[in-house]
Amino acid sequence: MSNKLATVGNNLDSRYTMAGGIRRQINKVFPTHWSFLLGEIALYSFIILILTGVYLTLFFDPSITKVIYDGAYLPLNGVEMSRAYMTALDISFEVRGGLFVRQMHHWAALMFVVSMMVHMMRIFFTGAFRRPREANWVIGVVLLILGIAEGFMGYSLPDDLLSGVGLRIMSAIIVGLPIIGTWMHWMIFGGDFPSDIMLDRFYIAHVLIIPGIILGLIAAHLALVWYQKHTQFPGAGRTENNVIGIRIMPVFAVKSVAFGAITLGFLSLLAGVTTINAIWNLGPYNPSQVSAGSQPDIYMLWTDGAARVMPAWELYFGNYTVPAVFWVAIMLGILVVLLIAYPWIEKKLTGDDAHHNLLQRPRDVPVRTSLGVMALIFYILLTISGGNDIWAYQFDVSLNAMTWIGRIGLIVFPAIGYFVTYRLCIGLQRSDREVLEHGIETGVIKQMPNGAFIEVHQPLGPVDEHGHPIPLPYSGAKVPKQLNELGFAEVESRGGFFGPDPESVATKANEIAHANHLEEVATLAAIQEENRKRDQAEGRI
């Protein structure tokens, strides 16, 4: 088999001379930190979304034409509904594997958006958006917005009671926009709500237009990551000019394929054992049946919460009235603009215009970290407020009280979160400096000649002629706080869950591990020497 593949490869290379370029690309190095896999979860979720979505399009009809249901779900037999809702029921109960695929599609959509949010939080808190990666930050924000819009259109297509309520709320927000609201509503819905062609428009946007744009932006995002090299956390041998990690072939590729399989398995498990969006319990959309408990998916819930806690501040211009929901749209627009512009805002305020390939620990940038926590608290409070009717019902609390708790909380708790986070970051910085200056606490108590007791510290570096540690500079890397991080702990025995490995296997494994460690030390020393020579040649030292 390998000989045949080699023959095919030689034939291709003789025609297209690809070996040189491919060899350089597959030798590219990627860092190994676990947080870099958060973006891959979004990528694999999108692939699963495409595969499951193609299957669902074979059976779904987005028509709003009214029909009388006569299918497998007996409680709804004889009920008038749209063809969209009827085909969604048929997919759930009559198409082989339809319910599994539909639920997997929904779970993958949630995973896609949430993983993008968490991925962008990692980018924000570690400073990976700084120059020269501002463009990738903007692409990420646009991807997040498109992912939310794609998810909203997706769960609006079945035309059930919940999706109809969501569409009606969006229709009201759009119409409430001054000057452009009516025109935007006509462009999106094709007329008054509900129009005969709105689901057809959403369907085209959901299965063709937005996925195509997302696919193109993902390709651009990955191309920029590939071209600009991956960021990495500070550490031994790591500089702004290199990347330390594993090669893309074969280790990184195998790990990525395995991680994709894990993502697929996890979503399959969720789709198989949990029910999500049980549209048969809701019935078709009927405005007279709208009630409490009408919440959207988690990534849209915060917008619903903003509409619920916003005071009824209406604007009056002559004979024209701008409803209070207008302020929700304004708030969303301001947040999107701030999110896109943040890299330039920080650069303007800090004066930092340098190229950065090394990441920052959140504790080392307390202002940014505190702003991020403040924004996260703001988002969580709005999300909780999106279900204030559920909270009020479950805990027998006044809905008006829940609304005011949300309003006051949005003012008080983000400010408290900023202050507490800032002080925590400063405290963590001082803790790192103390270890670098005095060493690691050993837990050994020593009595001095004068009777005082002190704790013995293990220095991290050299000591002076009096035995006192010489303070080490902080390099931005993780500072060890325990002795076992320096190798003082006992070596763990090798083996499986039920017993240790044979002595010969354990000895051989330890020898290999020791050889790998020596090779790593030699490689790091060579890298440091090359960096020193280059800096010396460029006049930096």
UniProtKB/Swiss-Prot annotation:
Gene source species: Corynebacterium efficiens (strain DSM 44549 / YS-314 / AJ 12310 / JCM 11189 / NBRC 100395)
Membrane association type: Multi-pass membrane protein
Organism taxonomic ancestry: Bacteria, Bacillati, Actinomycetota, Actinomycetes, Mycobacteriales
Full protein name: Cytochrome bc1 complex cytochrome b subunit
SUPFAM superfamilies: Transmembrane di-heme cytochromes
Gene encoding the protein: qcrB
Cofactor(s) needed for function: heme
GO CC field: plasma membrane
Record keywords: Cell membrane, Electron transport, Heme, Iron, Membrane, Metal-binding, Respiratory chain, Translocase, Transmembrane, Transmembrane helix, Transport
Known partners and oligomeric status: The cytochrome bc1 complex is composed of a cytochrome b (QcrB), the Rieske protein iron-sulfur (QcrA) and a diheme cytochrome c (QcrC) subunit.
GO molecular function: metal ion binding; ubiquinol-cytochrome-c reductase activity
